[in-house]
Amino acid sequence: MPAIQPPLYLTFLLLILLYLIITLYVWTILTINHKTAVRYAALYQRSCSRWGFDQSL
């Protein structure tokens, strides 16, 4: 058994850790983006309705 090669369980542990970190990272980004998108959509809709109302006068 070569000294360079790590044990199999260690490799699996690292892979699982990496997977968890990536999943958390992606989930956080998506959540933040969703919140900002919703906020911007609400602001945009409000400004559009106001603009439409002003145009109708």
Swiss-Prot record:
Signal peptide residues on this chain, from the entry's feature table: none
GO biological process, one term: symbiont-mediated suppression of host NF-kappaB cascade
Topological category with respect to the lipid bilayer: Single-pass membrane protein
GO CC, alphabetical: host cell plasma membrane; membrane; virion membrane
InterPro entries cross-referenced by the UniProt entry: SH
Keyword Membrane listed: yes
Transmembrane segments: 9-29
Major localisation: virion
Intravirion topological domain residue ranges: 30-57
Subcellular location: Virion membrane; Host cell membrane
Virion surface side: 1-8
Family indicated by similarity: Belongs to the rubulavirus small hydrophobic protein family.
Function: Plays a role in the inhibition of the host NF-kappa-B pathway. This inhibition occurs at the receptor level, by preventing the signaling of TNFR1 as well as IL-1R and TLR3.
Protein name: Small hydrophobic protein
Species for this entry: Mumps virus (strain Enders) (MuV)
Taxon lineage: Viruses, Riboviria, Orthornavirae, Negarnaviricota, Haploviricotina
